[in-house]
Amino acid sequence: MQAIILGSAAGGGVPQWNCRCPICAMAWAGDRRVLPRTQSSLAVSPDGERWLLVNASPDIRQQLLATPALHPRHGLRHTPIEAVLLTNGDVDHVAGLLTLRESQPFRLHATRNILESVSANRVFDVLAADLVARREVGLNETFEPVSGLAVTLFPVPGKVPLWLEEGTPEIGAETETTVGAMIEAGGRRLAYVPGCARVTEDLRHRLAGVDALLFDGTVLADDDMIRAGVGTKTGWRMGHVPMTGQGGSIAALAEVPIGRRIFVHINNTNPVLVENSEARRAVEAAGWDVGHDGMALRL
């Protein structure tokens, strides 16, 4: 199984288009300690020829250009992407579907709740129904979006997408709204969880024994955005568990047997984005890698 992290940042990327927080300012200045990053997306293949796209980032065209394995290969129209899978309905995970509208057949897989959020906005009807089949997937139901690639979706604590919030949203519920994906091929397992509000015992049990985990790295501490002076929301309010602190993902998963541990979906205010910073060194010392655009895994 092969996997490529197409986009490693949270919504808005790094640097964000209008942001001059300390980290974005470094990126705008070309400081090599802060790599530019596009928004969250992953490509997975059982053989390097046929690919599953997990989440369609607003930056998908840029990501495809940067990834030769995903370039058209023959004929007038072609893509090695056979299917797209959504783990939630967030803008940074669905907006890229609009870029994939150019008369190209593929299958779109998601839970009923996530598909309904897409169907609720008629702009996504540009994906012609006769070309893009929408396939509903049940939780804990194993299916093959690409032949040879077995996928099981499972609930993780989360919340509804920001654009669907009404009043005060329920945060941390385990429903079809936010899911993780267990992807298996050739006896190897990769877990992709780009959004998670907290680490539960059920999640710890499910992740035990995976060969690689790509996990929500949105915030280092719950108050990252507040400290940076660019927002008032905590990680919890956004539906994202912090890396550090009591209940943080590093501590919560420390005793779980996991092969490679990689943080993805990293917000522009997260100090781990600065190479060789105290935060980066601490995360790496705990056994985690900080994912970057173009990072490739072979399992």
From Swiss-Prot:
InterPro entries: Metallo-B-lactamas, PQQ_synth_PqqB, RibonucZ/Hydroxyglut_hydro. One of its GO terms (biological process) is pyrroloquinoline quinone biosynthetic process. This is Coenzyme PQQ synthesis protein B. Pathway: Cofactor biosynthesis; pyrroloquinoline quinone biosynthesis. Transmembrane segments: none annotated. The keyword DNA damage does not apply. May be involved in the transport of PQQ or its precursor to the periplasm. Pfam families: Lactamase_B_2. HAMAP family: PQQ_syn_PqqB (MF_00653). The keyword Transport applies. It comes from Methylobacterium nodulans (strain LMG 21967 / CNCM I-2342 / ORS 2060). It comes from the Bacteria. Keywords: PQQ biosynthesis, Transport. The gene is pqqB. Belongs to the PqqB family.
